[in-house]
From Swiss-Prot:
Originating organism: Cochliobolus heterostrophus (strain C4 / ATCC 48331 / race T) (Southern corn leaf blight fungus)
The keyword Oxidoreductase is annotated on this UniProt entry: yes
Record key words, sorted: NADP, Oxidoreductase
Gene3D superfamilies per record: Medium-chain alcohol dehydrogenases, catalytic domain (3.90.180.10), NAD(P)-binding Rossmann-like Domain (3.40.50.720)
Effects seen without this gene: Significantly reduces the production of T-toxin and decreases the virulence to maize.
Pathway linked to the protein: Mycotoxin biosynthesis
Pfam families: ADH_N_2, ADH_zinc_N
Protein name, UniProt field: NADP-dependent oxidoreductase RED1
Length: 352
């Protein structure tokens, strides 16, 4: 039996998740040489995506949401890239690299029903596989589908993106530049400002920890903004509402500033009346909605793959290595301590 390092969910956090209290790495025995379920596979998990939505799954089973809660005592789950090492499936063969939602652990034994949720990675441009967890994965599809479906960009407009250096924000900004928009990004430190402007081509960026957000928007967009792509919620959303032009669009992708707060601490946006006076469209979404990810998936994969290959779109992935770093990597992602898409490398791509 192999001692399989796994990221275990222990308790619904109060505030920020606490390593070894709310979640932690434990070894669980697994027989990777034993019988395989009919139609199933055994996977070696190579990479896992660390995303804000996982914080929302760290909750009690009595709390409803769009995604199911993690089960206390079981491994947490995420989008993984894995290599098939043994197979009893007609769909997947040993050596195939696949992606899907699976447990965060070194090896996984999947039943036939779970295998149906995994897809073989097609990689004609031979891109680094971790990119399939970023711009070519769920965050990329989130950015692409919502930018076009809800944002409805028009050349010459102004877009403001919060959490602009993150997995979703960095792609939205680059898509907006391709469409001829004036692109503004807010981030949490000066290094990230330099990254989005000099590295990604944003027209301007600002550090929200150094400037009052509303004053910064007045400075960089004195005539207002047409699209706000919201990744943080709270006071930033309130400030963006003041800056919106008539008939502007607000794409609500996430509210990471609110995820670790108690109900009494949540920020109450005070100027929602401006949605009426300025005829603003404000819309949230889930990437699996039929008019979002499924509608755009083929187009997204085709276009973004090509743009990464030809160098016109620049992905930024931050990779931490080793299951022992899983808890800290997750906290770093939630607190925005690193630049780019957060990925944990669980194992080497080769070998058993």
């Amino acid at each position: 039996m192999y001692q399989n390092k796994s990221l275990i969910f222990k308790n619904p956090p109060i505030g920020w998740p606490k390593p070894d209290v709310d979640f932690g790495v434990e070894c669980r025995p697994i027989d990777i040489n034993g019988d395989i379920p009919l139609g199933g596979v055994i996977l070696k998990n190579c990479y896992v995506s660390l995303d804000p939505y996982q914080r929302g799954r760290m909750r009690a089973p009595t709390v409803d949401s769009y995604s199911p809660p993690f089960t206390i005592g079981d491994p947490m789950e995420g989008h993984v890239i894995s290599r098939v090492i043994r197979s009893a499936s007609t769909k997947l063969q040993p050596g195939d690299f696949v992606s899907g939602v699976g447990p965060i652990q070194e090896f996984s034994v999947l039943s036939a029903g779970v295998v149906d949720g995994f897809t073989r990675i097609e990689n004609p441009y031979n891109l680094n596989l971790e990119i399939f967890l970023g711009p070519l994965g769920m965050p990329g599809l989130t950015a692409y589908s919502s930018f076009y479906e809800i944002g409805k960009p028009k050349k010459g407009e102004t877009i403001f993106i919060s959490a602009a250096s993150g997995a979703v924000g960095q792609l939205v900004g680059q898509l907006a530049k391709r469409e001829g928009l004036y692109v503004i990004g807010s981030v949490g430190d000066d290094e990230k400002v330099e990254f989005i402007t000099k590295g990604l081509g944003f027209d301007v960026g600002f550090n929200y920890k150094k400037e009052v957000i509303g004053e910064a928007l007045m400075r960089v967009a004195p005539e207002g903004i047409d699209i706000y792509f919201d990744n943080v919620g709270g006071q930033t959303l309130e400030s963006a509402l003041y800056a919106m032009r008539p008939r502007g669009r607000i794409v609500v992708s996430g509210m990471i500033s609110q995820y670790n707060l108690q109900p009494s601490e949540l920020y109450g946006v005070k100027n929602l009346f401006m949605v009426i006076t300025n005829r603003i469209t404000i819309q949230g979404f889930i990437v699996t909605d039929s008019d979002m990810g499924p509608k755009y998936s083929a187009e997204h994969l085709k276009n973004v793959s090509q743009w990464i290959y030809d160098g016109s779109l620049k992905p930024k992935i931050h990779v931490d290595t080793g299951m022992d770093h899983a808890c800290q990597s997750f906290i770093n992602m939630l607190k925005g301590r690193k630049i780019g898409k957060a990925v944990l490398q669980i194992a080497d791509l080769n070998g058993d």
